[in-house]
């Protein structure tokens, strides 16, 4: 698929950004893309100099939240370091769950994960839209 005007995960990424902003972690920037026409990516950037909601010692180079339809969500250290920390959530987890797990990991890395409500009523529709996009 090469049409990048409207990707099936655009609204999902926007919902995660909204959920992050609602709990005080507004990203510096974010976007969706398909780098190869096969994988769908969402990138949500955090700058260590602009966020009190981040343990600067644990994330000295900042971090970004990444998503793809196969691996799901992960926090990645810095723009160049690439230490990948999966959020251990379903690939189509509730935006509020993604936001809460991200906040917990940014504030207290290494601590046990708190339970979050992963179920999301938009998951099935998003997964179907992604499958249709992959098949096109």
Identify the role of each PLM range.
Residues 1-48, 131-136:
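N-terminal domain-onset segments
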Residues 2, 20-21, 54-57, 110, ...:
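Alpha-helical interaction segments
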Residues 11-16, 40, 72-75, 93-108:
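Hydrophobic alpha-helical membrane segments, chiefly transmembrane helices and signal peptide h-regions
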Residues 23-24, 60, 65-66, 113, ...:
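Intrinsically disordered, low-complexity regions enriched in Ser/Pro/Gly/Gln/His and often acidic
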Residues 27-77:
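Amphipathic, interaction-prone secondary-structure segments
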Residues 79, 83-136:
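Acidic, proline/glycine-rich low-complexity IDRs
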């Amino acid at each position: 698929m090469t049409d990048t005007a409207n990707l099936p995960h655009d609204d999902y990424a926007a919902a995660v950004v909204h959920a992050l902003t609602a709990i005080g972690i507004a990203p510096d920037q974010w976007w969706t893309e398909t780098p190869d026409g096969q994988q769908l990516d969402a990138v949500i950037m955090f700058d260590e100099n602009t966020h009190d909601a981040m343990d600067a010692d644990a994330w000295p180079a900042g971090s970004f939240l990444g998503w793809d339809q196969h691996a799901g969500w992960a926090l990645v250290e810095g723009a160049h370091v690439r230490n990948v920390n999966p959020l251990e959530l379903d690939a189509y987890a509730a935006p509020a769950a993604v936001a809460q797990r991200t906040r917990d990991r940014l504030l207290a890395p290494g601590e046990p994960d708190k339970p979050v409500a992963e179920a999301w009523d938009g998951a099935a529709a998003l997964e179907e839209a992604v499958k249709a996009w992959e098949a096109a």
